């Protein structure tokens, strides 16, 4: 099956890359603090 390798790609993507991306966006959001 072609979809048998999908969890081995999707789990690191959601578990590692998405938190790092969200933390980077949050860091840039805090640095460019133009709300206050």
Curated annotation (Swiss-Prot):
S-S bridge residues: none
Domain of life: Eukaryota
Keywords assigned by UniProt, alphabetized: Chloroplast, Membrane, Photosynthesis, Photosystem I, Plastid, Thylakoid, Transmembrane, Transmembrane helix
Membrane topology: Single-pass membrane protein
Main subcellular localisation: plastid
Gene Ontology cellular component annotations, sorted alphabetically: chloroplast thylakoid membrane; photosystem I
Regions that span the bilayer: 9-29
Organism of derivation: Thalassiosira pseudonana
A Pfam family that the UniProt record links to this protein: PSI_8
GO biological process, one term: photosynthesis
UniProt record similarity statement: Belongs to the PsaI family.
Function: May help in the organization of the PsaL subunit.
Gene coding for it: psaI
Cellular compartments annotated: Plastid, Chloroplast thylakoid membrane
HAMAP family with a match to the protein in the record: PSI_PsaI
Entry protein name: Photosystem I reaction center subunit VIII
């Amino acid at each position: 099956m072609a979809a048998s390798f999908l969890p081995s790609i999707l789990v690191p993507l959601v578990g590692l890359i998405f938190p790092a991306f969200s933390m980077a966006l949050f860091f840039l959001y805090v640095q460019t603090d133009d709300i206050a």
